[in-house]
Design a protein with these regions (language model features):
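Short, charged, surface-exposed loops that flank catalytic or proteolytic processing sites
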Residues: 152-165
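Short glycine/serine- and small hydrophobic-enriched flexible loop segments
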Residues: 67, 145-153
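Conserved beta-strand scaffold positions in the cores of enzyme catalytic domains, especially
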Residues: 26-30, 101-103, 195
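Extracellular/periplasmic Venus flytrap/periplasmic-binding protein
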Residues: 1-73, 111-118
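Solvent-exposed, acidic/polar segments of extracytosolic/periplasmic ligand-binding ectodomains
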Residues: 115, 168-220
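Extracellular/periplasmic catalytic domains that process cell-envelope and extracellular macromolecules
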Residues: 46-48, 71-73, 93-97, 158, ...
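A structural signal for well-ordered alpha-helical segments within the folded catalytic domains
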Residues: 141-148, 161
Length: 220
């Protein structure tokens, strides 16, 4: 896990989830965001006998980790959050080592054949031809979607108050991402994720459809 707020949040979440299965990590290894040599950390994982490694790190650290493990003959099942779910990017920078990695997902895969997704893809070609169509481009669409829906509900008489009221009226709104619900008290929106796996030729393989987090504290 990355030795910062992001990594530590992931570590704590992993601990809580494993505890529901009466399990715990056999190794918890911090790395600095800019660390370049992970030899000792990866050897520690290998020597521990860990069959699965959960990563909460940035793409560069993840790449170094996988390449290091390839040189020492260590092949665990890698699992990560949606932070590393851009399979096209990760496959390229790891030299193909990303195949088989399991991650969370923001929404539909960039290659999905869906009317709304196809519309967004064509719009991207027209209005942002210099940008690479992929998971994080699509994530921006997912994140902006509730605001677009609110603006549609407000109509021409736009104001801050009217927009906020429309946002707070959104219930189970879903397009290409998870269902989103906002209220005046709660703006978390959702805690649902999909689980996907990187297959051959950067194929997105759906392992688990939208699933809500039963441990989410914002609901309680």
């Amino acid at each position: 896990y990355q030795n910062d707020a992001y990594g530590k949040d992931g570590l704590e979440g992993g601990r809580k989830r494993l505890a529901t299965y009466k399990m715990k990590f056999i190794e918890e290894i911090p790395v600095e965001p800019g660390e370049k040599d992970l030899s000792s950390q990866m050897l520690k994982f290998k020597n521990s006998g860990a069959e699965v490694v959960l990563m909460f790190v940035n793409p560069t650290v993840a790449t170094i980790a996988l390449k290091t493990c390839a040189t020492i003959g260590y092949k665990p099942q890698w699992v990560s959050s949606n932070t590393l779910s851009d399979y096209g990017l990760m496959h390229k920078i790891t030299g193909g080592l990303w195949e088989g990695v399991i991650t969370g997902a923001f929404g539909m895969t960039p290659t999905a054949d869906h009317p709304l997704l196809n519309m967004y893809r064509e719009a991207a070609k027209k209005y942002a031809p210099e940008e690479r169509w992929g998971t994080f481009f699509l994530a921006g669409v997912v994140f902006a979607d509730p605001l677009v829906e609110a603006l549609k509900r407000v109509g021409p008489n736009l104001s801050t108050e009217a927009c906020l009221k429309a946002l707070n009226s959104i219930r189970d709104h879903q397009t290409i991402g998870p269902k989103v619900t906002w209220t005046p008290q709660i703006h978390q929106g959702t805690d649902s994720i999909q689980v996907q796996k990187c297959g051959p030729n950067v194929e997105y393989i759906l392992l688990q459809d939208w699933t809500s987090n039963d441990l989410a504290t914002w609901k309680k």
